[in-house]
Amino acid sequence: MTDKQQNKLWGGRFSESTDQFVQEFTASVNFDRRMYRQDIYGSQAHATMLAEVGVLTDEERDAIIVGLREIQLEIENGEFQWSVALEDVHMNIEARLTDKIGITGKKLHTGRSRNDQVATDIRLWLRDELLILEEQFLHLMQGLLNLAEREAATIMPGFTHLQTAQPVTFGHHLLAWFEMLKRDRERLLDCKKRVNRMPLGAAALAGTTYPINRERTCELLGFDGVCENSLDAVSDRDFAIEFCAMAALTMTHLSRISEELVLWTSAQFNFINLPDRFCTGSSIMPQKKNPDVPELVRGKTGRVNGHLISLLTLMKSQPLAYNKDNQEDKEPLYDAVDTLKGSLRAFGDMIPALEPNREVMREAARRGFATATDLADYLVRKGIAFRDSHEIVGKAVAYGVEKKKDLGDMSLSELKQFSDQIEDNVFEVLTLEGSVSARNHIGGTAPDQVRAAVARAREALDNT
């Protein structure tokens, strides 16, 4: 072999160079180099441990650590020359280290494989991203709570089947969004427990013959513990799948919220005004103000769902241990993280800026016989069985549809034609305020309950 397999770090066994197209097809450096910080961090910890167990001298350790620090600066200053011929982030950095410090650089890989190295890098990278995502969740959730508290008594229609159902408060509706995101954040925190385990030391698949101290490396890297089985450590990507499942659920919730915002900002609803900075216009229609942020988040949900399916499909037929298939884990994971981060950031800025059109909301709740259930409950309290009261109110609604009158707009004599149990005090329960205030229990839409729920939610966020 004349070119030493293009100076590849694994070229000793080969007698000819890799085909140029195959080299480009199998290289991952164009996307996995975003993990350079984690790769360097892991290598510095590995070198520290190797020196402590006597595999490296202190001088060799120091040369490696300083050399890696200089390489990080080269990368961050845009001076590093990435090579597709060196395949990935790991071999690019190791080759540059050897260029800088000589044969000592070739000792760094003692006691490890790219298999456990890349598994460690991904976990370190995802752990860093989870911290950012956690802050973004908190920012959005706190914004929701602030808005819910402010709108605790703002009345709007509650919907089922997108038809007016019962009056609720806008604050109560916002807290429903909050509850979705609360569960998503809990899933993120739970996912972190399984992300934060260290594969390093598993080597290729069976461990290593060197006297390594995995617990020490684990401590240096801030992992909660080591992966207990070397085969499993290098081969499974369930932690990435779990993250994508959490991300897909979160995006699904953001998509549901987006759908409501798109509807509510339309001229037909006009419940909400979205500030101009979150909208765009039309190239042909001068009047248009398009809710692009929620529309785009709704659209991006599909790609995150797709990334989850990609990773599940990637893993489903792989025998133990590592296979080249796993190179395909990174791009779906990276994009799922990027998409979720962007969506949470956009919502974190947009939600607190929502401007409700309170009178429009209230008028919409007044239409559509939203207090029909309240009238049925009123009759039950008069001693009428619920199914009978349901039928009575149904007839009253039919009359109201014919006469174009809401229940609260009918006279007492009109209402009494459906039941002689109806008295003057019926109008107390037919008001929108009376309807929402009557649901005065935990989880109910009464303004006092909304404020209490906000207080509990704030306390819970402060304690997690």
Curated annotation (Swiss-Prot):
<dbReference type="GO" id="GO:0042450">
    <property type="term" value="P:arginine biosynthetic process via ornithine"/>
</dbReference>
<dbReference type="InterPro" id="IPR020557">
    <property type="entry name" value="Fumarate_lyase_CS"/>
</dbReference>
<dbReference type="InterPro" id="IPR000362">
    <property type="entry name" value="Fumarate_lyase_fam"/>
</dbReference>
<keyword id="KW-0963">Cytoplasm</keyword>
<dbReference type="InterPro" id="IPR029419">
    <property type="entry name" value="Arg_succ_lyase_C"/>
</dbReference>
<protein>
    <recommendedName>
        <fullName>Argininosuccinate lyase</fullName>
        <ecNumber>4.3.2.1</ecNumber>
    </recommendedName>
</protein>
<dbReference type="GO" id="GO:0006526">
    <property type="term" value="P:L-arginine biosynthetic process"/>
</dbReference>
<dbReference type="InterPro" id="IPR024083">
    <property type="entry name" value="Fumarase/histidase_N"/>
</dbReference>
<keyword id="KW-0028">Amino-acid biosynthesis</keyword>
<comment type="similarity">
    <text>Belongs to the lyase 1 family. Argininosuccinate lyase subfamily.</text>
</comment>
<dbReference type="GO" id="GO:0004056">
    <property type="term" value="F:argininosuccinate lyase activity"/>
</dbReference>
<keyword id="KW-0055">Arginine biosynthesis</keyword>
<comment type="pathway">
    <text>Amino-acid biosynthesis; L-arginine biosynthesis; L-arginine from L-ornithine and carbamoyl phosphate: step 3/3.</text>
</comment>
<dbReference type="InterPro" id="IPR008948">
    <property type="entry name" value="L-Aspartase-like"/>
</dbReference>
<dbReference type="InterPro" id="IPR009049">
    <property type="entry name" value="Argininosuccinate_lyase"/>
</dbReference>
<dbReference type="GO" id="GO:0005829">
    <property type="term" value="C:cytosol"/>
</dbReference>
<dbReference type="InterPro" id="IPR022761">
    <property type="entry name" value="Fumarate_lyase_N"/>
</dbReference>
<dbReference type="Pfam" id="PF14698">
    <property type="entry name" value="ASL_C2"/>
</dbReference>
<keyword id="KW-0456">Lyase</keyword>
<dbReference type="Pfam" id="PF00206">
    <property type="entry name" value="Lyase_1"/>
</dbReference>
